[in-house]
Amino acid sequence: LEPALDRFAQQFAAPLFTAELVDRERNAVHSEFSAKKMEDGRRFYSVKKATSNPEHAFHQFAVGNLTTLENTDDNPLRPDLIEFWKARYSANLMTLAVYGPQPLDTLETMVQTRFGAIENRNRQQRTHSASLLEADVLPAKVTAEAIKDVRSLSLSFPIPSQRENYRTKPTSYIANLLGHEGPGSLFDVLKKNGLADSLSAGIGMDTGENATLDISIALTPEGLSRHDEILPLVFRYIDIVREQGISQQRFEEMQRLAQIDFRFREQGEPVQEAMRLSSQLQDYPADDILSAPWLMERYAPDQYRNILSRLTPDNVMVYLLAPQPGLKNPNLTQWYETPWQIEPLNAEALQTKAPGALAKALELPLPNPFVPENLAMVPGKTMDKPELLGNHEGMAIWFARDTRFNTPKANVFFSLRTPAARISARSHVLTRLLVDSINNNLNAWAYSARLAGLDYSIYPHLRGVTVRVGGYSDKLHTLMNRILMQVATPEVTRQRFDIARQNLIDSLQNKAKDRPVEQTSEFIQTALLEDTWSTEEKLLAAREVTLDELMSFAEALLSEVDPVLMVHGNITEAYALNLAQQIDAIVLGKSDFAPVERSRVRKLPAEEMLVSLSVEHPDTGYTLYTQGKTTSFEERSRFRLLAQIISSPFYEEIRTTRQLGYIVYATPFEMLETPALGFVVQSPTASQEAIDQAVREFTDGFENTLGNVSEERLEREKQAVISGLMERDRHLGEISERYWREIDRGADGFDSREKLAKAVKAVSLEELKTTFRNSVLNRDRALRVVTGGEGLSANKARDLILQQPPVTAK
């Protein structure tokens, strides 16, 4: 930690602003701008900036490119940077959080001796008194054009800053009701009528002087065509909250859940914790820094009403984002060239035109039945690893009692491995649509469980479908039972089928507009993994499947199964066995056992294969994947260690020195224990041939670097890999996920990371050099996937790879 703090503090105390490095970073900023220019999130954000108050700082461009960061003899950039640093970087305006294992006194000394050098220039905090949105423009609707098939409706209401109300959180109280997804909620009514896929509510922005409360709705195609009906419905629901939603009981429920969540808050990644704390120090007093996000100290009805008084039809900016919205003579945002237009709204119409049948269905949530009551720890010691309790009618039952974090939580994983899910691209699509139906049917009922600290996910995978339920163990069984009933007899409706199928088609079509390196990497995964299919194959299947076919598939999915159950955490063995009986009775009663083997990775041909993809993006994408010979721990350890040693020099050479792009990295590219290295570059300027030439020149030079690695350096790099592998678990979920991965790969000893760490420790420099020479220099078993230029087509390459045997398992 100390050497890192030495370097970190000097960046702020005495930055050099070396002219050459300033220009390099200028190019890096431009590369990032270019790489993300086609992303709808950034493009839509630029529309929000363009339609905000020109007098507010938010209106300004906040990314940077070669034009805005001009660096010429007449207008050099370095003096402006130095002036900016002197004006803005003053100790009295800065906050710092250091997170480490050392005692507090030691950490304090580390900080004072290093960060004390940052000058206190007694600068005043900059304020932005202008409103975020111009009052005389409201109410208005902004329509913007999306590149991808995305449809959203957002309402943004100017409200006073809420930073001083962090102890009472009136916006959290109101947003909890507006964003609720339970029966009768705004979202539930919209979803049941096929108009929306998701809804969220909360603070959009808070500058300290003013803020916005935002309601964001992801629309279905039907919702897009009827968005003018949705707006009055939103205001009708706000009226219901205003009339009926303010109550002591609701506050006490929210307060109780916040207290429980704070009491049993799980530790996050150290870097994320430090970032969160340093940021919150800008908003909260130091004494409250740990508890501030969870504080709800008192019932504050006047504050709730004050917020609600701003949520009116005459005080709203509505944003509609859609592909090809039919704009006439649109404006274009300055840097992202996003088409948009603005038009006034009729506030009176928004208040009076709510569709009658939909408005009558709206109601506020009932008391939450999932609020945990029993928060005690189960008796017994934490088990070292899961134990196999037996096989119940073909279902493997794994159990591990674990109370090491003193939190009354548990995680349950239940995998329905089934041959039906992996037959074809069509069965893959049907599995996804079936999972969507199950999730859709559960959402309204289970939303209260999410609010009460219970979480669940139901997701398709290579061998079938997995149900994961986790959180406070007290009422976990209630949620699990309802989920099992839906899995056993899912309700599939025509409306939901049509929406889910269209969402899947949109998602698959949008992949053609992903970043180039996302497309190159995805090609590698779908071409090499058994039981996966190309986007084109899945898209064709999605367009053809029918509702009748899905209903038949729902029955076929459970006809043959290879089920696995794991129960882990603050829970008893008796519960695990009882749950297994429940699963058997509800889900597996008519199922036959059929083993479903794990998928494998296909072996690449001996010589490098070059594949060229056609993408809808101006940047060049490049991914070089070099595959190991076997899945042995020894081979995996060599690739892990090689990635550790090569990643920083590769980044330094390709991104920093050669300035080829913003997205540059070398990384382990392991799939299903098959080791590999990945070299990834996305460039706004270089061709795929130029990128490959640069990569070859780098790897040629790196051979000497690797040959000169000292024994001391090698041991240091090994320790870095081992430390990453053996990093201490911070919360129950991390352990559950690791156990579940071990069960999936059949590693009943639950010691894969220990074996891999041992193998890393044993790697010799000669072994490392041989692996580098064969895999990186000679490119044995290499797959280079690029955008543009020469190469095999995706279909031709996939056909060749499909003929290959799997990588040797050891």
Language model: regions and residue ranges:
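In a subset of proteins, long, contiguous C-terminal domains/tails are tracked
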Residues: 761-810
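Long, low-complexity, charged/polar intrinsically disordered accessory regions
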Residues: 302-312, 328-338
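Short alpha-helical segments and helix-capping/turn motifs at coil-helix boundaries
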Residues: 13, 30, 80-82, 137-140, ...
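M16 family metallopeptidases and their MPP-like homologs
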Residues: 1-11, 42-71, 93-99, 150-161, ...
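Glycine-centered hinge/linker elements that transmit conformational signals in sensory
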Residues: 108-124, 579-594
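Hydrophobic, small-residue-rich alpha-helical packing segments that form membrane-like cores
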Residues: 21, 26-34, 39-80, 84-91, ...
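His/Glu-based metal-binding/catalytic segments typifying zinc-dependent metallopeptidases
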Residues: 34, 123-183, 271-292, 322-324, ...
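Non-catalytic, conformational "gating/processing" segments within enzyme and secreted inhibitor domains
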Residues: 26-27, 41, 78-113, 547-583, ...
